């Protein structure tokens, strides 16, 4: 607590002291200002006459430079005579002609070299690609893939078509074969296709039998259904007749009972009336 009180006291004393504005500048300038204030003021504010004295030599130097440039750019007509100018023109024309001749000479060997190169290239092309050797095109026919025709409705016709295609492909594969080779090839294919044909025929016969069986079964089923319908209708008619007969019997019984009751009532009434009369 004591330390805090001491610090607050010091801060209050420091804030109470007057603050002086700091003057900018070095110590030497401060001393000069204090000793010779008038001289410093005149040094900081020079006269306009002094400025003109400083600018005059600069203007003279720049004017001399511009004069030199003009003399260099403009041709001196007074020193040169018309004869000298003509000689200079002739020299220029001769130099241009010589330069053009040199350029033509330089271009001509290039053209000759280019023509020689083209000639050599034509000869090399002719040597590389001779036209005497005939070109033979190699033909590779696709190999046919055998597939079974089981389970097809048109298996017989499909087998005949595939057989004709095989014959054509065999002709394409062996164009130079003899007739004997061709006949042997056909016989081997027929022997190979014989079991396939028999299996195809059996499949076809089974399919036809399976088609005929449902055709035969359909009229029988229709007859049976008709017979069953007739029997049911007859039974229904019998049941309805029996039911009606029972209803009639019940009605008759009910009527008979009512008649009996009426008769009894009438008899009682007659008895009562007779008793009263007596």
Curated annotation (Swiss-Prot):
Q: Which residues carry this modification: Phosphothreonine?
A: 66, 178, 183, 208
Write out the entry's keywords from A to Z.
Answer: Biomineralization, Cell adhesion, Cytokine, Glycoprotein, Phosphoprotein, Proteoglycan, Secreted, Sialic acid, Signal
SMART domains from the entry? Answer: OSTEO
InterPro entries listed in its UniProt record: Osteopontin, Osteopontin_CS
Q: What Pfam families does this protein map onto?
A: Osteopontin
Cell compartment(s), UniProt: Secreted
Query: What is the protein's quaternary organization?
Result: Interacts (via N-terminus) with integrin ITGA9:ITGB1.
Give the UniProt family note: Belongs to the osteopontin family.
The protein here is known as Osteopontin
- Tell me the organism's taxonomic lineage: Eukaryota, Metazoa, Chordata, Craniata, Vertebrata
Tell me the name of the encoding gene: SPP1
């Amino acid at each position: 607590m004591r330390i805090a009180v001491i610090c607050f006291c010091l801060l209050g004393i420091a804030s109470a002291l007057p603050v002086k504005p700091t003057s900018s500048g070095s110590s030497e300038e401060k001393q000069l200002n204090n000793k010779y204030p008038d001289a410093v003021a005149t040094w900081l504010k020079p006269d306009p006459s002094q400025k003109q004295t400083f600018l005059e030599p600069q203007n003279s130097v720049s004017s001399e430079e511009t004069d030199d440039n003009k003399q260099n750019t403009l041709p001196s007509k007074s020193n040169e005579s018309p004869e000298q100018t003509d000689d200079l023109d002739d020299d220029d024309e001769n130099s241009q002609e010589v330069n053009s001749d040199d350029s033509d000479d330089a271009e001509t060997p290039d053209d000759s070299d280019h023509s020689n190169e083209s000639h050599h290239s034509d000869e090399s092309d002719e040597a590389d690609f001779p036209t005497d050797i005939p070109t033979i095109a190699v033909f590779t026919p696709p190999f046919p893939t055998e597939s079974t025709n089981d389970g097809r409705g048109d298996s017989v016709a499909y087998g005949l078509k595939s057989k004709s295609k095989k014959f054509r492909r065999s002709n394409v594969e062996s164009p130079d074969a003899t007739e004997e080779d061709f006949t042997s090839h056909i016989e081997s294919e027929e022997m190979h296709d014989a079991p396939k044909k028999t299996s195809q025929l059996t499949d076809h016969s089974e399919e036809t039998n399976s088609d005929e069986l449902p055709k035969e079964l359909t009229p029988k089923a229709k007859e049976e259904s008709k017979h069953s319908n007739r029997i049911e209708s007859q039974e229904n008619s019998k049941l309805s007749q029996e039911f009606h007969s029972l209803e009639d019997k019940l009605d008759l019984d009910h009527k008979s009972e009512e008649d009996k009751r009426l008769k009894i009532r009438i008899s009682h009434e007659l008895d009562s009336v007779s008793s009263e009369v007596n």
